[in-house]
From Swiss-Prot:
Binding site for Zn(2+) 2: 107, 141, 363
PROSITE patterns on file: ARGE_DAPE_CPG2_1 (PS00758), ARGE_DAPE_CPG2_2 (PS00759)
InterPro entries from the UniProt entry: ArgE/DapE, ArgE/DapE_CS, Bact_exopeptidase_dim_dom, DapE_proteobac, Peptidase_M20, Peptidase_M20_dimer, Peptidase_M20A
Cross-referenced NCBIfam families: DapE-ArgE, dapE_proteo, PRK13009.1
Protein name: Succinyl-diaminopimelate desuccinylase
Amino acid sequence: MPVLTDPLQILQALIRCPSVTPHEAGALSTLEQFLTKMGFHVERPIFADKNTEDVENLYAKMGKEGPHLMFAGHTDVVPPGDLENWKYPPFEGVIDQGKLYGRGAVDMKGGIACFVAAFARVLEKRTIKGRVSLLITGDEEGPALNGTVKLLKWAEQKGEKWTAALVGEPTSVKTVGDVIKIGRRGSISGIMTVKGRQGHVAFPERAANPLPLASKLIQSLIQTTLDEGTENFQPSNLELTAIDTGNPAMNVIPAQATVHFNIRYNDLWTKEMLMAEIENRLALVQSKNNNGQYPYYQLEWIPSLGDVFLTKNDKLINTLSNAIKSVTGNIPECSTSGGTSDARFIKDYCPVIEFGLPGQTMHMVDECVTVDAMETLTSIYECFIVDFFA
């Protein structure tokens, strides 16, 4: 059993569980052993959904009264890729020249290890007047259908309510504590299919080429910016992610063209407003091009679980910022940049902020974290916990 105040030993134990999403591979069981030894009551609900594998989750709680701090995270990791490219095996947790290597070291077993060690250090020195829980899923890197979103609902039905939540995602950029996340942009994806009529390129009058209309529709999506951004958010942006005709032949006019796109949007928009804006742009182009005759387009919106949000709880933000300053001497930047995370689910239950290790190597070959970064984050978490319950 690792020394529970040592984040490196905890992280090594977690990394040695090859928990490639959505497989548990012993990671939650290992974490449960640590938490049980510390005095937590641990439960392991399993959730399922159609066309997905069952996923194990963990909810651990200590305390019965007072403010309730939730720490949220995930033990599932992305695949390591070609093992030949790794300096050290990705599931051994080798420490070399001040760095600990392994898949999940940064995203985000390292954050979990630091919080567990931080809380163990707190318990050695004082009694917390409040409640602490860990909400840990094995389905964050995958479709995120059987993880945090269901675990929150399950816990709420059991009477759980939280004062605030800290998500241990790797938010830092260059050094531990330089950036915390106080919100996230929303995300929505669409598939536009432009229908034509297949034919021989030598006889275009017998066909209806979907590509000229597709190019005009694409231009309507990208030529005008959605907005200029806000005080707390970057400008919303639409990115094309795929264009395909399924036609490798040089002498065939394709039957259709398919365009995939994703939009990351700020708090100037709701999902419904944004969908209406895109639909209006496309309809205007179509009305000038045969108005529903071949070629024409169809638009499908992909269900999204990522709405835009901004945490405005000054007390929570200041408590974390002050903890960072007391350990590092620096004041963190409050940011909303980057992709989505499970904070998008938690924000419906309590104020939530995100803070963790530097993320330069996450999802990469030779993912690693420095020994110094682990100690710094553990110290900040410890200070934050103490101040939260002060």
